[in-house]
Amino acid sequence: EQLIAQFNVLKFENELILLKGARKFSFEKITAQLIGQTHATVLEVNLNALINNLNVYKNYLPKETGVIAMVKAFSYGSGSTEVASLLEKQHIDYLAVAYADEGVALRKDGIQTKIMVMNPDAVDFDRMQEYHLEPEIYSLQILQQLIEKIGQQEMNVHIKLETGMNRLGFVESEQEELIAVLHQHKNIHVKTVFSHLAASEDEQLDSFTKEQISIFKRLSETFVASFNYPIKKHLLNSSGILRFPEAHYDYVRLGIGLYGVDSSATIQEKLLPIGKLKTRVSQIKQVPKGETIGYSRKGVAEKDIKIGILAIGYADGYDRRFGNGTGEVFIAGQRAKIIGNICMDMCMADITHIDGVNDGDE
């Protein structure tokens, strides 16, 4: 009883726990506490599927080409530390985050793999230095801010070049000054030079993509030749890996493909979805013809129907735009359309055509 009373201050996560003792100790109460789930709605992430997806892409790469895995935005909503830890065990070359605080959180959780920060802020350079994070440098201004912040301390950086995306990156006219500044500050070590393709998935824009590849080849060769130490290159994102093998370079950046989505049918058929959003049927109701369902009476029973009230709503991330027949769910292995508006914590599905559904079913 004392142990159960203290569960609110004890934290267990991903632990293997052995409960051993006589029946009189009522260990079943402890088991119930450990496995208890307070919310019927969960996002289940299949890490084995993620490994499959990683290997699918690796099969298209030469052995000497490494992988930079994007784990920004909570690993595309899949769990930052969990995904990063798995990728670390797969000996990934680099992890990439959008902001420094994402990288700091991974370091605090024990991740030791090299981490690239793709959208650094000058106010975070101290923390990046402390936690061994490597910022992307994309302008002379951000480079100067880094120099002022770190003084003579050493720091690894990644230089981004503009090749046609018109997002972050040094334009060609800045390259000479960039090289000169880096030569003056030898404590700043360039680990990679890279750019980003704007339309690698779109065959109709292949001429533009090939022009980007050509520009990157020219600019990166000039840049790398200006230093007396090795600097690696990367250009391709997930959708470019299959389509532009001539641009594999030293690394590729795996983003959404790692999580199961690719524009190429050849690759997509080999990928596995890693996420499954699950909930339970709270109640089943018979709704007579002519009655309405949900807010604003948007759902209308055109005939006698059976609905399932589900324990998921827009507060759980199930977008309100999925209401009124737009969204579907799987119940008992069959598709069921959402009827009526999505509520904050609930929604309703038309299960008239599905037999054997009971309260509490997944």
Regions flagged by a language model, labelled:
Residues 1-52, 100:
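ATP-dependent carboxylate-amine ligase
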Residues 6-7, 29-30, 80, 107, ...:
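Short, well-ordered secondary-structure micro-motifs
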Residues 9-13, 54-65, 153:
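Glycine-rich phosphate/diphosphate-binding loops that line cofactor/substrate pockets in enzymes
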Residues 19, 106, 193, 281, ...:
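Residue-level signal for inorganic ion chemistry
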Residues 27-39, 43, 104-110, 266-274:
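C-terminal helical cap(s) of enzyme catalytic domains, especially alpha/beta-barrels
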Residues 42-44, 49-51, 65-232, 248:
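Active-site-proximal beta-alpha core segment in soluble small-molecule metabolic enzymes
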Residues 44-46, 51, 59, 66-69, ...:
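Active-site anion/phosphate-binding pocket segments in diverse small-molecule metabolic enzymes
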